[in-house]
Amino acid sequence: MHGFEGLANGLTLYAGLCRAHWDHVHPLSDNGDNELRVGSINWLLTQTRMLCGALPVLQGTDRAFSLTDIDTARQRSQAASAAAPPAEGKPAPLSMDAITRAQRNTPKARLLSLLQGARKLPDALAQLEAAIDERLGAEGPGFATTRDAVGDTVSRLER
């Protein structure tokens, strides 16, 4: 898996294909109707937002943790005083202790590499947005929520 850098490279590749080969990019326009294309691009934007939270950023002893996992652990930690302990034989729920251990155990070089990859995402998304806007104009999908998710991801990794 190539993480945030792979995601950025994929968006950049798709932007280039849209610029250079729009008439042949799947799904094809149906006599000027771009509804399927817009739907496919919306799907890509949704997946990009999801991946921003789901890609692994920390390596624990038995699993990797994503930004979504960190959020979940933080929420559980805040609600821990009201929660019952896990049933015997069931794994303990995700905890801030596990996240803290993973933060200590994840090599700094890995974290810096993840951050470098994530920092490529805003430009890659901007390239795709420009390519789509050039071809579809107002008919194209909105990029704002994906742009916000990408920006939030970069900000969180910079902390």
Feature roles, as predicted:
Residues 1-5, 13-159:
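Polyanionic, low-complexity intrinsically disordered segments
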